[in-house]
UniProtKB/Swiss-Prot annotation:
GO terms for cellular component: endoplasmic reticulum membrane; endoplasmic reticulum-Golgi intermediate compartment membrane; ER to Golgi transport vesicle membrane; lysosome. Residues 1-25, 87-101 are cytoplasmic. It is found in: Endoplasmic reticulum membrane; Endoplasmic reticulum-Golgi intermediate compartment membrane; Cytoplasmic vesicle, COPII-coated vesicle membrane. This is Vacuolar ATPase assembly integral membrane protein VMA21. The chain crosses the membrane at residues 26-46, 66-86. The gene is VMA21. The lineage of its organism: Eukaryota, Metazoa, Chordata, Craniata, Vertebrata. It comes from Homo sapiens (Human).
Length: 101
């Protein structure tokens, strides 16, 4: 059996990422917004249904389901918009830092 030389091994190495800290930052952002996407709409649904629509406004059970669902859908869209905004700014910041090098 032949032993591969070092030049051949170096050619097979995977490409290096720009920065390990940028990967960690991106992963933290993604996990943060994933947690928000799960907790905020569900929490707002039950909170607004029980305390606002049925409690404060005195709506029926059927009506409170409907309006609480609307609040949850709006919350999902707000979280998605915030994620897109943060991801867009993070990407442009990393691009500017890479361009200055």
């Amino acid at each position: 059996m032949e032993r591969p030389d070092k030049a051949a091994l170096n050619a097979l190495q995977p490409p290096e990422f720009r920065n390990e800290s940028s990967l960690a930052s991106t992963l933290k952002t993604l996990l943060f917004f994933t947690a928000l996407m799960i907790t905020v709409p569900i929490g707002l649904y039950f909170t607004t249904k029980s305390y606002i629509f049925e409690g404060a406004l005195g709506m029926s059970n059927r009506d409170s389901y409907f309006y609480a669902a609307i609040v949850a859908v709006v919350a999902v869209h707000v979280v998605l918009a915030l994620f897109v905004y943060v991801a867009w700014n993070e990407g442009s910041r990393q691009w500017r830092e890479g361009k200055q090098d």
